[in-house]
A protein has these predicted regions:
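Aromatic-enriched hydrophobic runs in primary sequence
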Residues: 31-37, 57, 69, 75-76, ...
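Generic hydrophobic, helix-prone segments enriched in Leu/Val/Ile
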Residues: 1, 5-10, 71-76, 83, ...
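N-terminal leader/targeting segments
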Residues: 1-56, 163-164
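Hydrophobic transmembrane signal anchors and adjacent membrane-proximal interface regions, especially
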Residues: 22-25, 30-36, 44, 78-81, ...
Length: 164
């Protein structure tokens, strides 16, 4: 996964002004194949959903699913290191991804890091990049990354990774 996630996130963010039209492949029910691939990911897709009465697209990558908390935690940390400080260009503006790190705890069933685009402005405020580690039944930990629009101004985690 050496910088592969960073490259993918950069590609997706840079196509944000185009509504991801250059990166969406064949449509499914409510999802689209992603032309942006991650060799070790278990699934990468664009998902269409409704937000405040409008149709929006989000990008989701399931990086790993494992029964081993330590392995999931290691993958989560490696993904964070790829994204923290990542420089991207959206339209004519340059941004850096920033988020404080939180160590996933075995007793916590969900850890979420929401990256902000800096410098923040009215255009970039709603774009969120999120890294998640969550516990799923029967006994698995999943690590994934998401890019989505958010109208709310709060610190609650966004969408939970859906099953691919």
């Amino acid at each position: 996964m050496k910088n592969e996630l960073a490259t993918a996130v950069k590609q997706v963010l840079e196509d944000y002004p185009n509504g991801y039209s250059n990166l969406m492949g064949e449509p499914g029910d409510s999802s689209f194949e992603s032309k942006v691939k991650l060799s070790e990911a278990e699934g990468v897709q664009f998902v269409q959903h409704s937000l405040s009465g409008r149709s929006v697209i989000s990008w989701q990558a399931r990086l790993v699913t494992t029964e081993d908390h330590a392995e999931a935690k290691k993958k989560f940390r490696a993904a964070y290191q790829q994204l923290q400080g990542l420089q991207v260009r959206i339209g004519s503006r340059a941004y850096k991804l920033r988020s404080p790190y939180e160590v996933p705890n075995l007793d916590q069933k969900f850890t979420s890091l929401v990256f902000e685009l800096e410098p923040s402005n009215s255009y970039s405020e709603s774009i969120k990049i999120e890294l998640q580690m969550l516990f799923q039944m029967p006994m698995e930990w999943a690590v994934g990354a998401l890019i989505y629009d958010r109208d709310r101004k709060d610190t609650d985690p966004g969408r939970v990774l859906r099953s691919f």
